[in-house]
Amino acid sequence: MQGQGITGKKNAVVFCALWLLTFIIYLPAVKAGWVIDSAGWLNNIRNLSFWHYINNSQSGIPSLYQFTQFTTYIFYKLFNANPYAWHTLMVTMHAVNSFLFFFICNRLFLDSGIKNAFNIAIAGVLLYTVCPHISEVIVWEAAFHYLQGFMLILLILLCVQNFYHRQLKKYAWFAGLIYLCSTYSLEIFYLTPWFVLTLALYYRYVLNYDHSIFRKVIQWFFIPQLLLFVLHIIVLKAVYGWFFAHIGENLLQPFTSYICKPPRYIFHILFLGRFFPLDSRRQVYFIVGSNAGLIIFYNIFVLACCYIVSRFTKMTMKGKTVVLLFSWIVIAQAIIMPLAFPDMLLVYFDRYTYFLDAFVYMLLALLASYITNKYISIALLTVYGLINLYFTVKVNLLWKHSAYITNRLLKNFPDPGNKIVLLLDLPQNMDGIPMIGAEKEGQFKMMYKLFVNKNIPNKIYDVVAYNMITRDDGAHVWVHNDSLMKVTLNQWGTWWWYVGHGAYSYENEDYKLDMKDMGHWYDLHLKHPADQYLILLQQGDQWKIVNMKKRGEDQY
């Protein structure tokens, strides 16, 4: 059976609506995103040669990202670091992904003879667009390759679907070229052949398309992709000595570390687990990660699989489509299981679920269509969508506030004269939204040069950073003598960071840091006379200069 599809005009309306919705939702965060890895990327593209940048030779990460690096190089030449241009680009790429996913699913539902195919597909993609889990990918320029990677997968699936409708060789050539490019981008291309295979099996054995078409899909799409994948692994091994890109030794984890993540992601995505109070969230993570929780979850999973196998031939077309989407969720889960699970802050590592979210919400919309009373179905999806939208707006306001503070700190940095600068409490993030952070090489100095366009020859040290919770957070200092001070966070529930992890004691030629309590305070010992330093405290969006002659009281 072949669906009739929708008109080009209706497609244009859907795309424009998705773009406009995404643009409006993320407009508050338009100036955010140029932080942490994004700033490092911008520094690389401005200071490395073309070939060093394209080959990502400075990163130290075992990955082949030449296609991604090349495309970002082109966009940089077009936009420089203009926040409005980059924000529009990221919004547009997400709108394209949402539309492609809608188009593929709508056609899939039509081909399957599912009633209200358009309404189901549009409901699923709207849930995806308004969910709060995708903000990191849309706002943070360093997540460009997630937008690109998912787009490449969707374009290939569209080629396969088109081939089933019209057996033209050009679709196989397009898919092969796209997959070749994707092997030099984000590693989610590992999954593409399996998405292709499951879609091909569905059209052959569920929709009963001719076996000769299925054979050609295997020969012209699936097998060439497997060969390109093997070629990628060979090149990766030859260049870096690793068989798996990017994550390397992260594969060597306890088995339970892998299997506890799927139930946690269900809580995280479907039930907005990240927005639960920390204690409640940890309790849920503990329960689903316990032996009893895992036994229950995987017993349910196995029973569901057994039911699918035993009843598949008797299922309705809608039921079989549910199975296809379910299989795509399982495939998408597989690649993120070795990665760190985001169990603490908001937004942090949400990019890992960008493509998984799409399948989850489309499946949810399809399941909701089983409710016979359409008004109840619409009401439930609307309420659920509005709850998601509420948290998305909340997250985007955090992006906005964090960007305001970061930009103010850069703009209002005092003239250091000829002194050594110590930045005692840089903001690492705002409840998970990345900000500046503390790096050995000097993150603040690099960002100051990039965004204020001034080069300061002085030594500027990122002493430590901390995670902000509110816009007014900061720290205070108690000066003991002319070479020793105690630095304490003003608020509880935050902690000290250094080089992207929990802070620790260290020293260099200009000072020694003694971390007393990673969640509250540290001692700082100066190695030179106090008048050789400019010591700065961050309070909200302001810098405060520490007076080393003012002793016996807290300085805020």
What is each of the regions a protein language model found here?
Residues 443-506:
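Luminal/periplasmic acceptor-recognition loop/helix of membrane-associated glycosyltransferases
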Residues 432, 474, 482, 508-509, ...:
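Intrinsic-disorder/low-complexity loop/linker signature
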Residues 496-527:
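Preference for solvent-exposed, low-hydrophobicity sequence contexts
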Residues 2-459, 492, 499-501, 525-556:
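Polytopic membrane enzymes that build or remodel cell-surface glycoconjugates and lipids
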